Amino acid sequence: MLVSKSIASRAGLASAVASRSCRPSFTAMPLRAKVLGQQAPISTQAAAELFKPVEGDEPEDVLFNSLYNLRSVELNRPAKYNALNGSMIRKIAPRLLEWERSDMANVIVIKGSGEKAFCAGGDVAALAKQNAEGPEGVKKSVDYFGLEYKLNHLISTYTRPYVAFLDGITMGGGVGLSIHAPFRIATERTVFAMPETKIGFFPDVGASFFLPRMPGQVGPYLGLTSALLKGVQVYYAGIATHYLHSSSLPALESRLAELTPRDYWTIEQRLSVINDTIEEFSTGVPYDENIEIGGKIRLAIDRCFKYDKIDEIIAALKEEAAEGAKGGVQSWAKNTLEELTQRSPTSLHVTLRQMRLGKSWGIAHTFKREHQMAAKFMKSHDFNEGVTALLIDKGANGPAKWKPASLDEIPPGANISEDYFRNDPEVPVLELLNDRSYMQYPYNKFGLPNDYDVKEAIEKGNFTREKLIDHFVETRRGKQGVREAVSDVLDRMAVRSKGTEHVQWKKE
């Protein structure tokens, strides 16, 4: 049984809020005009050709279901932890396009089969074996990433409400199916990571967009270290927008199917009703778990990962790990250093540059750039070596033998990431399924308040600490975890104004 900080019945609250928030607003602009630009969707005929089945595709690796106004996608490879492959993409993308054109599909749910995984990533072992066949195999792998990123971009710009159940392992390709959605639900079984630097690759599937936009240096930290987050920590970090117990997901899905939006509702109103419906099923956050990426650890992450060179990050971590260091995070710093020494040096350099550049990329440009980067990695030593050592041989022949073998082998000032950010003349620029794009997520308000939100509130008004926390609890309508999240931000980033009880943001 989940023991929570606050267990309260929310039935009735959501319906009351929904009735207030869903009054028609005839001046509100629709999603397509307001955020995503002119729509240029792929034709049905072109989609059928692009995603047509190929020999070897499994017939039931994805299951689709319709219940009233809800359409669901169920990844159905539980024995493989629902690892994503081309066969699955060729089923999911055309179905999403079909539902986007349907007036009957009012909410989409994506989930994984079984209790262990939502989606543990892409089937990279198959890609490494394919690459070993030579240029034709490499081309097939590059084409796979093209299909995957087309699907990721479609999800990131989707015009129907999209809800992802991150119930179980959610890594790599599974992150691409979920992270760009307005609703991302973590459970006590969720395990999140972007493990690409472990296998000589880079955080892809739109991580170039998502990670750099996280507060402080949390995104670069997650991308470089492949750090694991579990359960409610995925929610506290802002990767999930909601935290529910896994046992409530079937009932939530049934409840979402019963929602009947009015034709005149804006997308904001539709999303608000879905948000309130999800909140009905919240039973609170575990009472005995502090925020892992918070407090001293979060301050150390921001101190160490703010640099633009890997050797400067390593030096900062060594300083934090030294005996007598004032940060009080010696154990964390030592563990982080150990993790980084095991990663592909090339992957670390590419990923750090990606984190810095990605902040200025639009969502469409992100997937086009990542496609070019993936093409370079398919031809690289480290990807094929890393996947073979870790996932195919499973360590039987020792750890991966990177080239260069270690960070120390890279000469000072050498720019080994440069080539990965140049277009490959043999790889055409990726054509996406529509021309929609944006610079910030258009509906990024359903998760917990973060540093950006708290800073904005402090700068707009005079608040005492408790009044500010109460402000967020009230404006987020009692959302579980708000008090803990805002308190952590204030502990790290705010000070009391001189001579008053009001808080102000620390000078950076």
Swiss-Prot record:
Main location: mitochondrion
CDD domains to which the protein is assigned, alphabetical: crotonase-like
Family statement drawn from the similarity comment of this UniProt entry: Belongs to the enoyl-CoA hydratase/isomerase family. Mitochondrion-specific ribosomal protein mS47 subfamily.
Gene Ontology biological-process annotations: valine catabolic process
Protein's name according to its UniProt entry: Small ribosomal subunit protein mS47
One Pfam family in the UniProt entry: ECH_2
Keyword Hydrolase applies: yes
Quaternary data: Component of the mitochondrial small ribosomal subunit (mt-SSU). Mature N.crassa 74S mitochondrial ribosomes consist of a small (37S) and a large (54S) subunit. The 37S small subunit contains a 16S ribosomal RNA (16S mt-rRNA) and 32 different proteins. The 54S large subunit contains a 23S rRNA (23S mt-rRNA) and 42 different proteins. mS47 forms a protuberance of the N.crassa mitoribosome and retains a solvent-exposed cavity liekly capable of accommodating a substrate, in accordance with it being an active enzyme as well as an integral constituent of the mitoribosome.
GO molecular function terms noted in the UniProt entry: 3-hydroxyisobutyryl-CoA hydrolase activity
Enzyme Commission number(s): 3.1.2.4
Superkingdom per UniProt: Eukaryota
Reaction catalyzed: 3-hydroxy-2-methylpropanoyl-CoA + H2O = 3-hydroxy-2-methylpropanoate + CoA + H(+)
Organism of origin: Neurospora crassa (strain ATCC 24698 / 74-OR23-1A / CBS 708.71 / DSM 1257 / FGSC 987)
Keywords from the UniProt entry: Hydrolase, Mitochondrion
Subcellular location: Mitochondrion
Any single GO CC term annotated in Swiss-Prot or TrEMBL for this entry: mitochondrion
Enzyme class, first EC level, given as a word: hydrolase
Sequence intervals crossing the membrane: none
